[in-house]
Design a protein with these regions (language model features):
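Conserved PLP-enzyme active-site core in the AAT-like
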Residues: 27
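Short, P/G- and charge-enriched loop/turn segments at secondary-structure junctions
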Residues: 5-8, 74-80, 152-155
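Short aromatic/hydrophobic "clamp" motif used to bind/position activated sugar donors
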Residues: 30
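A recurrent flexible, glycine/aromatic-enriched loop bordering the glycosyltransferase active site
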Residues: 78-89
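Catalytic metal- and UDP-sugar-binding loop of GT-A-like glycosyltransferases, i.e.
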Residues: 33
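Active-site-proximal specificity loops/subdomain of glycosyltransferases
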Residues: 1-22
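Conserved donor-nucleotide/metal-binding helix-loop-beta segment in metal-dependent transferases, i.e.
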Residues: 37-75
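A glycosyltransferase accessory/donor-loop signature
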Residues: 87, 92-207
Length: 207
């Protein structure tokens, strides 16, 4: 509870550290996904993937090169200029994660006042700081971010395509809200829900 949190990022964001540590010595790699991600394609390439010895994780970048440069400067880590990633998708090399003591070092950094002053996305920024130059960058299809609020705009570019594997529903509106289920991009979630044991569970209503 001593770690930084905000209204948008509760202490649940740090569960990815616990998950990674739990699977050390149990499996060679583990796939972490945020709870607001839905799968609409095969993950067989991830299952078959073998990490080179010097890489800790596979990730997907967000933003463009100019954004990466800004994050590298503000976080004080030059390697981030090669790619700043969203921590909602992490394919983790468990042996390397353990060898690098990523979880322990991240938690230690999150207790340092000087680090806290720099960060805006607590777990994500710290992981970018720790893992720069130790990453494999995957195609955006493995973490395609989309806010349902985009659909309120007169025009927008939908990044979700038939090739998208993981749709990451960012923003405050989620497909499990009862006012958002019928958006086209929500249908992947609805199909999964209707095929699940929770098919008869009501969608969330406004508070």
């Amino acid at each position: 509870r001593s770690l930084p949190s905000t209204k948008n990022w509760t202490h649940a964001i740090y569960f990815r550290f616990v998950i990674a540590d739990y699977f050390i010595s149990k499996v060679a790699k583990v796939l972490y996904l945020d709870a607001d991600i839905i799968c609409q394609g095969t993950i067989e390439p991830l299952i078959k993937f073998s990490f080179p010895d010097d890489k800790v994780a596979m990730v997907v970048t967000e933003g463009q090169a100019d954004w990466w440069e800004k994050r590298a400067h503000s976080l004080g880590v030059a390697g981030i200029s090669k790619g700043y990633f969203n921590s909602g998708f992490l394919l983790i090399n468990t042996a390397k994660w353990a060898a690098q003591q990523v979880s322990a070092r991240a938690i230690a950094m999150l207790n340092e006042p000087e680090v806290i002053k720099k960060i805006t996305h607590p777990d994500q920024d710290v992981l970018n700081m720790l893992l720069a130059d130790k990453l494999i960058f995957a195609d955006i299809k493995y973490n395609t971010q989309f806010s349902l609020n985009y659909q309120l705009k007169e025009s927008f570019i939908n990044p979700v395509t038939n090739n998208t594997i993981f749709i990451h529903y960012i923003g405050p509106t989620k497909p499990w809200h009862d006012w958002a289920w019928d958006y086209p991009v929500s249908q992947a979630f609805m199909e999964a829900k209707n095929a699940s044991p929770w098919k008869n569970t009501a969608l969330l209503k406004p508070n």
